């Protein structure tokens, strides 16, 4: 039961972050959103790490810290692409596409020559077909032609980069999850600050500061909850439940934002989320 509660908390936290960040991404700087979410999250993670974390010791652990930091740098690109997707598209459409980062992780694992479960060979085609159906919407003039739905390209790009982040974090497994999060978060902030200063994009409108601060705290909480869930296990249960982030985001978009994807897109959403759930069973 503890694993289920922690995993559900993680999924709900990420879905709520997507919902809360949509108006920020549309009205303010995407870079400022990434910067301040990560600053708040890193401060929260650092506070927890000061109590239960340990600094790396020895060559293997410092090598792992390097991979964690590199993952943090890639996270900057992933978050920028993701917030751009949220600024342009419907939550119920882009969120399932963002969830297919696990499919990209599998592809990268295959590229480097590692073996995968047979279930993956079912999930990957589902993810491709589901992603394609979700990404296109009917033309406004009522004709049979279709065009790419707003934000879907950015969502797929974010998923691909998050897939790389997962691989890099996997290489940092010699460290405790909270330590990985700390080094990744510090690298994210260090990479984002110069970008924000160079583009003069660090200012966040006052009306969004509470929202972004809450998202930063939820981001840290989700990370800690996920780390605890994976430590308790079993991992397939954690993977399946956390994979429902996309499902929760779809429901939030349809219920709270009044979004209405087309029938074809709904079919794509179902296929995509099914693929993500299947991939969760082999996590």
Regions found by a protein language model. Give the residues of each.
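Structural signature of hydrophobic alpha-helical transmembrane segments
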Residues: 1-13, 58-75, 114-129, 175-189, ...
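Membrane-interface interhelical linkers
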Residues: 1-13, 20-68, 79-89, 138-153, ...
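Transmembrane alpha-helical core positions of polytopic small-molecule transporters
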Residues: 14-15, 41, 67, 71-79, ...
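Hydrophobic/aromatic residues within transmembrane alpha-helices
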Residues: 24, 33, 85, 111-116, ...
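Hydrophobic alpha-helical transmembrane segments in multi-pass integral membrane proteins
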Residues: 44-56, 105-120, 160-178, 219-236, ...
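C-terminal transmembrane-helix exit sites in multi-pass transporters
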Residues: 82-84, 103-122, 195-200, 247-266
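Hydrophobic transmembrane alpha-helices of multi-pass small-molecule transport proteins
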Residues: 100, 104-109, 119-138, 264-283
């Amino acid at each position: 039961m503890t694993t289920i509660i922690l995993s559900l908390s993680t999924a709900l936290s990420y879905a709520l972050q997507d919902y809360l960040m949509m108006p920020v991404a549309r009205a303010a700087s995407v870079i400022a959103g990434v910067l301040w979410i990560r600053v708040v999250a890193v401060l929260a993670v650092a506070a927890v790490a000061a109590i239960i974390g340990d600094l790396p010791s020895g060559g293997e652990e410092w090598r792992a810290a390097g991979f964690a930091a590199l993952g943090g740098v890639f996270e900057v690109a992933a978050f920028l692409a993701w917030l751009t997707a949220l600024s342009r598209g419907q939550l119920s459409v882009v969120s399932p596409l963002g969830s297919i980062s696990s499919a990209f992780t599998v592809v990268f694992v295959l590229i480097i020559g590692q073996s995968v479960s047979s279930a993956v060979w079912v999930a990957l085609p589902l993810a491709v077909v589901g992603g394609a159906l979700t990404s296109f919407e009917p033309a406004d003039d009522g004709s049979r032609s279709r065009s790419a739905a707003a934000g879907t390209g950015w969502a797929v790009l974010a998923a691909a980069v998050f897939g790389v982040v997962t691989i890099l974090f996997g290489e940092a497994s010699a460290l405790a999850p909270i330590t990985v999060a700390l080094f990744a978060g510090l690298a994210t902030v260090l990479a984002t600050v110069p970008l924000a200063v160079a583009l003069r994009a660090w200012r966040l409108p006052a009306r969004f500061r509470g929202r972004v601060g809450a998202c930063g705290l939820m981001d840290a909480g989700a990370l800690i909850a996920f780390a605890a869930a994976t430590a308790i296990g079993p991992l397939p249960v954690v993977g399946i439940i956390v994979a429902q982030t996309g499902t929760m985001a779809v429901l939030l978009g349809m219920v709270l934002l009044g979004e209405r994807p087309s029938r074809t897109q709904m079919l794509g959403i179902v296929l995509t989320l099914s693929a993500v759930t299947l991939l969760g069973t082999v996590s």
